[in-house]
C-alpha cells in the first residue's frame, strides 16, 4: 500500500491526540505467532517517522528485553516488575533508551512470572499496568508485547490499552483459541475498558508457496473480514535475525521484501488511526 501523509506523522499524531499517548498491545495467547517481532519492528518503523516510542515487555520470557538490551546487561537494569510491586518505584528509573533514535523500552526479567502471581492477591491488580502508564508521559506510542496466555498480565494490557493488534501465524492457527481470545476481549470491553478495540489482525510468517498457508490466510480473512490488514509479513530468516540482533528488519536489511512489508503494515496502522491516508497502490505492492 502506498501512503500519503496528511502532514508528517509525528505532527499529525500529536495534533489528533492532543498529546495523549496511543497505547497498542500485540495479543494472542498462542506462542510462536510473531508478537515480539511485530512489536519490535513496528516500534522501529514508527520511531523512524519521528514519533517517540516506548516498548513494553510484558512477557516473562523477556525475549524483547534480552534481544534489545542484551542478556548480559539486562540483569543490571530495573524492570517493570519493580513498578508492579512498589508504588515508590519510578518508571523513568526503569526505561532504557535504545540506539535507534526515538525508541525506548521498559524491560522485564524472568521474575515477572512470580510477580504476576503476587499481584493477583491485590484487589486492584487488573488496573496495575494502567496505573503505571499514568505515571509515564512524553511518548507518542506505547507498544506492549504480551505473554502467550490469557492470564493477569494480558488482562492488564487489555485494560491499559486502547487498541489491540492480533498477530496470527498460519502454522499455529487455531480457531478455537481465537474464539477464546475474542471472548476475553469482549468481556473486558463490556466490564472494564469500554474504549478497547481491535485495531486489526496481522497475518504473520506467511509462505505463499505453501497452499495450506494460503488456505488458512483466506480462512482468517473470511472470519475477521476488514479487520485483517492487507499487508502480510512473510516467513523469512531475516526477521528472526533482526530480532536476535535487537534491531528492526528495516535497519538490518532495508531493501528486503520483509522490510517493505513492515513499512506497509506500519502505514496501514497509521492509516487506521487516522494519521495518514491511503493513496493509489504502488507498483509491486499488490497482494499476491
Question: What spans do the regions from the language model cover?
Answer:
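P-loop NTP-binding core
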Residues: 1-288
